[in-house]
Amino acid sequence: MKSPLLHLAAALAALVPALSSAQTIVDEWPNVKAPAAPTLKPVSVDPKTTALLMLDFVPPTCGARPRCLASLPAMTKLLEQARTHGMTVAHSVTGTTKAEDILKDVAPRAGEPVVQSSIDKFRNTDLEKILKDKGIQTVIVTGTSANGAVLNTATAAALRGMKVVLPVDGISASDTYTEQYVAWHMVNAPAVAPSTTLTKTELLKF
C-alpha cells in the first residue's frame, strides 16, 4: 500500500503539465475583448476651487508627439477660458526643460506657477501646497504623456482627496491605444475612479 505522501507526490506530479501549459494574460492577449468605451460627461466647475494643470507642453514631449500638437488649439481655448474666469492655472516641465521652453501657444503668464518633476508633478515639488493654499478641490488635468504625467499626476491628485476632471481631447500620447487605456484606467481604478470624470473641452462649463 502506498503511503499518503506517495499519493500526494503522484497528484502533484500530475498537476505539473497542466500548470506549465496554463495560459497567461499575454498568451490570451489576441482573444481579450476591449471594454465598452467610457461615457464622456458634461462637467460644471467652480473657478474659485478648480485648477487647470497644463502638463509638459514642451518640445521634447509635446513636440515629439503629433497628437499633442494637434491638441493645442483646444488647449489654447481652454487655457483662455480658465484665465477669463480667474481660475488657478499651473504648468509643469520635465527633464532639463524650463518654463521658457513651454510652447508659445500655451506658455505661462506672470504669476502662474511652473513645477518641474518627472511623471508625478506632486513629487518633490510645491504643487500640493500651491493648490491647498488656494483652496483647490478640483483639478482639470491636461497634457502629455497620457500614460506618464497625466496618469500619475491625476492619480496623485485623486489620492489626495481632490476631484479630477480629465478632458480626453486634452491628453495625448504617442499612440491612440495608450490614450484609450489611460481613459479606461482612470474611471475604473480603485480609489481613483470615484473621484474622476471623463469629459471633453466643449462639455466643460465654468
Residue ranges and their predicted role:
Residues 53-55:
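Short hydrophobic beta-strand that contains or immediately precedes a catalytic carboxylate
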Residues 17-21:
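N-terminal signal peptide c-region/cleavage motif recognized by signal peptidases
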